[in-house]
Amino acid sequence: MATANDVVLRAITMDNFAECLHLAVREDQKGFVASNMYSLAEAKADGVSIPCAIYADRDLVGFIMYDIAANVGRGYVTRLMVDARFQGRGYGRAAMGLVIERMKAKAACREIYTSYVPENEVAGHLYRSLGFEPTGEVDHGETVMRLVLYDGSFAP
């Protein structure tokens, strides 16, 4: 299984843009996550999302997108996909770990939210295993999860 040391996040540039657009989940997973083309267009339009290519060694294996709303102390992981050829190797977990660490480094980020299509049991298991808990909310048919980084209390 991959670890955060095996995986790096890189900016989407003209050098990897086309390859990123060609990443795809399995056919039975297509309803679980927006296409990378849509996600990149959304990032360009909203001006706050941070899209990243997930690399393992020299291979582009997936895509993750997040943003940090410092004014409300929240981070959001809005997309995570690993190409069908590279699934089951721990790359999604490693990429999530890297994004969580980036958000922890932002003092204003106290909690992280994400969501998943309920039928995507693998995503639900992944997020729970990383410490995310269901909020009880449903957003556009997706189960909302939250990871508390800092609850405002101080340890003695």
Kindly label every feature range from the protein language model:
Residues 103-115:
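Conserved GNAT acetyl-CoA-binding A-motif
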Residues 93, 118-136:
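Conserved active-site alpha-helix within GNAT-family acetyltransferase domains
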Residues 2, 143-156:
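Terminal substrate-recognition subdomain of acyl/acetyltransferases
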Residues 113-124, 140-142, 150:
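Conserved beta-strand-loop-alpha-helix junction that forms the acyl-donor binding cleft
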Residues 6-78, 83-85, 96, 102, ...:
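Acetyl-CoA-dependent GNAT
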